[in-house]
Amino acid sequence: MNPNEKISYHIDALFGKGVSSVLPRQLTFSYSRKTGRIKSFGINDQLIGTLRSDGGIALTIFGASILLNESSFKQNCIIPKEEALPFVSEGRSLFCKHVEWFGSNINIGSEAVVIDKSDVVLAVGKSVVSQSQLLGRIGDVAVRVREGIKSRGEQQKP
C-alpha cells in the first residue's frame, strides 16, 4: 500500500473522516530498519507525527496545527481556562478543573490537542479521562502533556 494512503487512512480512523484531506501530498517517511514499517512522517525535515506501538499517532505541535485546518479535527481538542494557559504551554499537565471545553472525540488514552480560544495549538498530549468522566473530577489530570509551545529551558532566569 502507498505510504501516503496508509497515513491518510490511519489519521481518518483516529481523528475523524476527512481530517487527512489537509495533509500535503509530499510527505517524507522514516522506516524501521528491522521491520520496514513506517516509524514517523513529516514535511521537509519537520516532524508531523510518530506511529505508536498501540496503533495511535503521537502528533507534534506542528502536525496538530496542520490538522487543525480541518474543522472536524476540533473534536479532538481541549480548550483550557485562561488561568491554565501559561502552565500548559510550558508543557505541564492539564487538570480537570481547568478544562473549559472538551471535544467529543476524545477518549481515554487518545491523542489530545490543547488549543486556546483562537484555535492556536498550545500543547499536545495523551488524554487520561473521557468527556463523561470529566465532570466529577476536580484534582485529577485530564491531559498528560507531552510537548508544549514553550520549553522550560528557553525561559529567562531572574
Show which residues each predicted segment covers.
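Beta-strand/loop-dominated core regions that host nucleotide or nucleotide-derived cofactor-binding catalytic loops
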Residues: 5-33, 37, 43-108, 112-158
